[in-house]
Amino acid sequence: MRSIRPLLAATGLVAALALTATACGPTEEEGADKPAATASGSTEKGGGIPADLADKLKKHGVDPDKWRDGEWKNWDKDKWLREAKDFVNPVIEGLWKPDRMKSAKDPAKTMSAGDISGDQGVTDPEPRPVTAEREKTPYHNYAAPVGKVFFDSPKGHMVCSGTVVKDPKNPGKSNLVWTAGHCVHAGSAGGWYRNIVFVPAYNDKGKSAAALRNAQPQEIAPYGAYWADWASTSGEWIKDGGPTGGEGAPYDYAVLHVKPEQGTKSLEETVGNALAVNFDAPEIARISAMGAWGYPAAPPYDGLIMHKCVDRPGRLSISPATPTMYRIGCSMTGGSSGGGWFSEGSDGKLALVSNTSIGPVTSGWLAGPHLGEGAEQIFTMMSDKYGAQ
């Protein structure tokens, strides 16, 4: 019989995340009179692509005007930028309208039992299923740092989850978002995804599809859509990531830097808080509970409602040559990918320690990477690069 200690810890963990929300969210009056912000980044007057991005596109043989007018839909291998240094994500004004967001699909990373037989020596028994619980609304009061990551892939409009994280070089004014590598890059078979945006507090009041049918844009994206002007993921994910995670799964993490709308506050100031990232979490046996938050989109879920799972973590090994991953019981499905996993540190404060990467075809559990030295290097690089922005 499982110990009741994780259940006690879980209660504290849920309360701790609720306490992180300090934002005074959009008021009813603001929602009625103001359209949702759509982060325009540093676009030139008239909606043009910034000169630096235009030059970068030209360097790769892409006409900036044609890109804006639909050339981004060309996924031919010679046009699909792949290397870490080649990320481009020009803002296309008005692209992510509410209906486009609602039509986005999950980039499912599912595995069969045979996919995880590489090293059973460090794989614990499969956890009991934990039914995901709906987050309380409004989300900006209970899980302010959590939101959705939208992007385009060769398969169409896609969606993941993400978390606003603290920026050590920009305290209190972070524009960094943590998500999964497979939410920004296709891995070994492809390149960078396109039109990547972060939408904090998506569907803030947790309304149903029917209730949102005639909703105003600010009901879908109360703080607008923040376009990523840079993304970074692990070299291992770019090299080894696959449709079911593969040997890239233990390195399936990414950091986005998003650009606030000109003249507005940082993302952290806007939503009211951000989570620290802990790259030195204790060994799994010493962690009594982890909580995963996200927006599951594959059946039986529809991607509109934020959910959470809390469980004592176990170990999952994909290969003897790769780091052991965390695994928890959770019924969340695709769409929750990239969502943060949180745990209390020795100081009693909540921190992000992983993100949703993979799960089985039948759901029932989720696995996420251990964030170690490699993840910290990527994060530090992003903080150093954008610390003053």
Residue ranges, per PLM feature:
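Chymotrypsin/trypsin-fold serine protease catalytic domain
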Residues: 249-326
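Solvent-exposed loop/turn segments at secondary-structure junctions
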Residues: 154-157, 169-171, 182-186, 203-206, ...
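C-terminal cap/linker of serine protease catalytic domains
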Residues: 263, 362-389
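Secretory targeting and sorting signals
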Residues: 1-28
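Conserved catalytic-core segment of clan PA serine endopeptidases
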Residues: 134-144, 150-153, 165-168, 185, ...
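N-terminal low-complexity, Pro/Thr-rich disordered segments
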Residues: 21-139, 244, 389
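N-terminal carbohydrate-binding/catalytic regions of secreted carbohydrate-active enzymes
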Residues: 87-194, 198-201, 209
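Catalytic nucleophile loop of clan PA
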Residues: 331-355
